[in-house]
Design a protein with these regions (language model features):
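Extracellular Ser/Thr-rich, low-complexity/disordered mucin-like segments
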Residues: 369-387
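Acidic Gly/Asp/Thr-rich repetitive segments characteristic of extracellular carbohydrate-active
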Residues: 30-68
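Short, T/G/N/S-enriched strand-turn elements that build extracellular solenoid repeat scaffolds
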Residues: 53-60, 72-81, 85, 181-183, ...
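Extracellular beta-strand-rich solenoid/capping regions of secreted or surface-exposed proteins
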Residues: 72-84, 92-113, 126, 133-152, ...
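Glycine-rich repeat segments that build the extracellular carbohydrate-interaction surface of secreted
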Residues: 49, 58-73, 83-90, 325-328
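Secondary-structure capping and domain/repeat boundary segments
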Residues: 282-360, 367
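Beta-strand-rich solenoid/repeat architectures in extracellular/passenger domains
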Residues: 89-97, 114-140, 155-168, 184-201, ...
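A cross-kingdom C-terminal cell-surface attachment/processing module
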Residues: 383-404
Length: 406
């Protein structure tokens, strides 16, 4: 009886527990480690706005917005709650004083552009296509001023013609070591200015910039960190001088103009070169180029700053019985004007010198000097040898005949 009772009791416990378990795993409770997103509602659609008043009010309420027309504002848009601003191919222009956007209170502002190819007409015809943020003028951060603890995710749109009257970033300022900028996609910063030429026309960074894509035209003052997000498929392209200050670290990015380095460089691609002014460049910023002579000698290695060109060796290698024809990368002759962006092994190619076989004779056609020896063979000539032998035999025969007669 006891053996039968135990399985029955276990079955009853299981049946009673199933409804409770089902309710638990489908509750959507974020503390549930198995199904933490069940029942979660999607984010609300952005509010369509076509004028400054609706834009200001929606942002004040913490609502994401989508521009449906060009909008002119006269005062800074204060972002104190996390939201998304979709420029949607339109122009957001500041005509008063101050930054166009200021992010505070640990908020996250995401800027997107649903229509990056949308052309502009009329008074905006000279602006780049797509969504545009323009006209800001402030002490620092003419376009966007990002306070410490805040995050800007710039995935699209163009920040252009914004100005900082001081040295701090005509385009974007990361004001504090806890400010974070993610730049990616089609985002661009261009034609911005700052009060000091050594300052930051485009970006003044005291925090962390994730250079995951987009383009920056103009100078950058880096006193924080420039790096990549984990798994990022692209890098931001910097087309102006970058001043890497003593507190600055560069770990990623493509730099088409000079980087003036007083800080630390551990990675990146430096097509414009680096001027090192007391800074440090770690091995991670270099690539190794091997020269394999294929002549029995040990391959030579050279460290090249990533993005720079490797110099062609001044002396060609040598190999007995061969002529050197050049350095090759795979099956193609290497172009030494190519920037090095990855490890390379260059191999010497050789052409075998053809060997000459048989006898070599010297047969002059004219007698240019009295003391020249005509017809002098360089090696034994069978014809000449035969002629000499017959001559000797003939003389010997004549001698013998003469002796018999006497």
């Amino acid at each position: 009886m006891k053996r039968r009772l135990l399985p029955i009791l276990m079955t009853l416990v299981l049946v009673c527990a199933l409804p409770i378990w089902a309710a638990f795993v489908t509750s959507g409770d974020v503390t549930n480690p198995l199904v933490c997103t069940a029942g979660a509602s999607p984010p609300p659609e952005p509010v369509a706005v076509s004028n400054a008043a609706d834009l200001q009010n929606s942002i004040a309420d913490g609502k994401s917005v989508k521009l449906t027309d060009n909008i002119t504002i006269t005062s800074t848009l204060e972002i104190a709650r996390s939201l998304t601003l979709d420029l949607n191919g339109h122009v957001l222009k500041m005509t008063g004083d101050g930054s166009v956007l200021r992010v505070s209170d640990c908020a996250t502002l995401t800027i997107t552009d649903s229509r990056p190819q949308n052309p502009h007409t009329g008074s905006y015809a000279g602006l780049p296509a797509g969504g545009v943020i323009t006209g800001g003028k402030a002490d620092k951060g003419g376009g966007i001023l990002l306070a410490g603890g805040c995050t800007l995710k710039l995935t699209g749109g163009c920040i252009t013609d914004c100005h900082a009257t001081d040295t701090g970033g005509g385009g974007v300022v990361l004001n504090g070591d806890t400010a974070i900028l993610y730049m990616s996609g089609t985002a661009r910063i261009e034609n911005c200015t700052a009060g000091e030429t050594w300052g930051a026309n485009a970006i003044f960074n005291s925090g962390t910039m994730y250079a995951d894509g987009g383009t920056v035209d103009g100078t950058v003052n880096n006193q924080g960190t420039i790096r990549l997000s984990e798994g990022a498929a692209a890098e931001t392209v910097f087309n102006g001088t970058v001043y890497n200050r003593s507190a600055g670290t560069i770990k990623a990015g493509r730099y088409n103009e000079t980087v003036e380095n007083r800080g630390t460089i551990t990675g990146g691609t430096f097509c414009g070169g680096v001027t090192n002014d007391g800074g440090k460049i770690n091995d991670g910023a270099y690539e190794t180029v091997k020269f394999n002579s294929d002549n029995g000698a040990q391959a030579k290695e050279e460290k090249v700053l990533r993005g720079q060109k490797v110099a062609k060796p001044t002396d060609d290698p040598t190999k007995s019985g061969h002529t050197f024809t050049g350095w090759y990368l795979g099956d193609e002759k290497y172009n030494f004007d190519t920037p090095v962006t990855a490890p390379l092994t260059l191999t010497a190619k050789w052409e075998k010198v053809p060997s000459s076989g048989g006898y070599y004779y010297y047969h002059p056609t004219t007698d240019t000097k009295a003391d020249d020896t005509k017809g002098s063979p360089k090696t034994a000539d069978p014809g000449v040898a035969l002629y000499a032998a017959l001559s000797i035999l003939s003389l010997t025969g004549l001698t013998c005949t003469a002796r018999k007669k006497f």
